[in-house]
Swiss-Prot record:
This is Small ribosomal subunit protein uS4. The keyword Ribosomal protein applies. One of its GO terms (molecular function) is structural constituent of ribosome. GO terms for biological process: ribosomal small subunit biogenesis; translation. The lineage of its organism: Bacteria, Pseudomonadati, Thermodesulfobacteriota, Desulfuromonadia, Geobacterales. Keywords: Ribonucleoprotein, Ribosomal protein, RNA-binding, rRNA-binding. Part of the 30S ribosomal subunit. Contacts protein S5. The interaction surface between S4 and S5 is involved in control of translational fidelity. The keyword RNA-binding applies.
Length: 208
């Protein structure tokens, strides 16, 4: 399945929820879902009864789009989560949260996960002192993500770090803004994920 390259705001309207795909725009009145809180398309404002399967599918699509994951990779994450100890749905969210691109976004180095993914791919970071360019890499407690010296003058990164206060940083991460450095203090817990996600619906979908 190819990666979606169309309007990001259209995805938010389709899922009926803010996915925060457009960075700072999502926090302003320009946010599409604040202006038109109904699905896109000719019949977007009509009322359509959705089946249980449809509800489960929409939830899966919503989470997949929040984190920018393709279907095959997302299914792989679910299978990994299902083999782990604990609650499968929560395990899935923890795997997604521990992706390196998500951590870069959570720390405020980028205004969106897509932007963070590009920064990682282009080699702007080091992890524990070594250059890294794999967005899907799973971080662990004690890992240190730092912006490389030559990247610290990139205006977009500096502006994003200045605006991170509005978004907030999860308890399991710590940012040293002056050092352009973030530390993974612990593994995420369910309470750290404040987005309106019903992960059990995804478990039910894949368990059919």
């Amino acid at each position: 399945m190819a990666r979606y390259t169309g309007p990001s705001c259209r995805l938010c309207r389709r899922e009926g929820s803010e996915l925060f795909l457009k960075g700072e725009r999502c926090y302003t009145d320009k946010c599409a879902i604040k202006r038109r809180s109904y699905p896109p398309g000719q019949h977007g404002q009509g009322r359509i009864k959705v089946s249980d399967y449809g509800v489960q599918l929409r939830e899966k699509q919503k989470v997949r789009r929040i984190y920018g994951i393709l279907e095959n990779q997302f299914r792989g994450y679910f299978e990994t989560a299902d083999r782990m100890k604990g609650v499968t749905g929560e395990n899935l969210l923890f795997i997604l949260e521990r992706r390196l691109d998500n951590v870069a976004y959570r720390l405020g180095f980028a205004t969106s996960r897509d932007e963070a993914r590009q920064l990682v791919r282009h080699g702007h970071f080091t992890l524990n002192g070594r250059k890294v360019n794999i967005p899907s890499l799973q971080v662990k407690a004690g890992d240190v993500l730092q912006l490389r010296e030559k990247s610290r003058k990139v205006a977009a990164i500096s502006e994003s770090l200045e605006g991170v206060v509005r978004r907030g940083i999860p308890q399991w991460l710590e940012l040293e803004k002056d050092a352009f450095k973030g530390t993974v203090k612990a593994m995420p817990v369910r309470e750290d994920i404040t987005m309106p996600i019903q992960e059990q619906l995804i478990v039910e979908l894949y368990s059919k």
